[in-house]
């Protein structure tokens, strides 16, 4: 019984080490209305090229919004109407990096932006 508990604990600890997913965003800043900004997200701890990725934002009112998504090979993308034609999501699987090019920025684009797996 005691051995069984130790084994389960060991498996859980090892699983936690193997699942050390890290996503680090960069490129944010203050921009004038109508301006542009490019965000980057460096990924590690998982096989980046195997996953759909997305960008989400948290508004000043704490609401979460999906702003863009891309499939694993970059061949298919999705945008809600609020950003369509202004935002472009892309990825570089060789560099394990996700990008979000934002242009014609509006006041309602003010938010914290996060990449997500």
From Swiss-Prot:
Source organism: Mus musculus
Name of this chain's protein: Ig heavy chain V region RF
Signal peptide range: 1-19
GO biological process: immunoglobulin mediated immune response
Region annotated Framework-1, chain positions: 20-49
SMART domains for the chain: IGv
Molecular functions per Gene Ontology: antigen binding
Note: This sequence belongs to the VH7183 subfamily.
Stretches the record annotates as Complementarity-determining-2: 69-85
Disulfide cross-links: 41-115
Keywords per UniProt: Adaptive immunity, Disulfide bond, Hybridoma, Immunity, Immunoglobulin, Signal
Ranges for region Complementarity-determining-1: 50-54
Region span, Framework-3: 86-117
């Amino acid at each position: 019984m005691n051995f069984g508990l130790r084994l389960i604990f060991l498996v859980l600890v090892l699983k936690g080490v193997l699942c050390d997913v890290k996503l680090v965003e960069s490129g944010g800043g203050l921009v004038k209305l109508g301006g542009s900004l490019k965000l980057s997200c460096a990924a590690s701890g998982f096989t980046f090229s195997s996953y759909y990725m997305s960008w989400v934002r948290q508004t000043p009112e704490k609401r979460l919004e999906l702003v863009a998504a891309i499939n694993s090979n970059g061949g298919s993308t999705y945008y809600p109407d609020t950003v369509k034609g202004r935002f472009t999501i892309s990825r570089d699987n060789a560099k394990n990096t996700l990008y979000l090019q934002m242009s014609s920025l509006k006041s309602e684009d003010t938010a914290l932006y996060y990449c997500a797996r």
